[in-house]
Amino acid sequence: MTKNILIIGGSSDIGLEINNLATAEGHSVYATSRDEAVSNSYDNFIHLDPNQSLDALDDIPEDIHGLVYCPGTINLKSLQRLTLEDIKAEMEVNFYGAFNVIKKVLPNLKKNDGASVVLFSTVAANTGMPMHSSIAASKSALEGFAISLAAELAPRVAINCVAPSIVDTKLASHILSTDERKEASADRH
């Protein structure tokens, strides 16, 4: 059965890989990003900022089987350098955007028993790591939201939150720029 999958964060390497896997299985992917440069990577691309108007999502299919929320941020700063604006920006991307999108497409998800939402968190949300305060706070909010929402929407819609460590992507390239840095990151986890 062909399923309709909505990916928020389609310009991320993770979003692109999920698209590749889903389309290889014959599913229809609808991907969004604030970056229109990736539009040619998708059959169904939607230019969207999850914290602005979500009207562009009015054109997705009425039945969505899966939602993947995977926009990413890496803003590593000490507490002395961290500003309230930094925290707000992380919350906008990592938490408020997820809230906005899920609320908007929930009717589409509820049309399918067994629909699924996958949210991307980080290991930093539950592991004390230097200079990860803002991402840990925003992703912890996302995890708490996921747990409560899973209880609220079960058994019709499954809500899951995955928390990978740093992934070797363009977003993390400045952190994993040398073999030594990659090894240090691997040793940490």
What are these model-derived regions, one by one?
Residues 107, 150-155:
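Alpha-helical segment proximal to the catalytic Tyr-Lys
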Residues 122:
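Residue(s) in the substrate-gating loop at a strand-loop-helix junction
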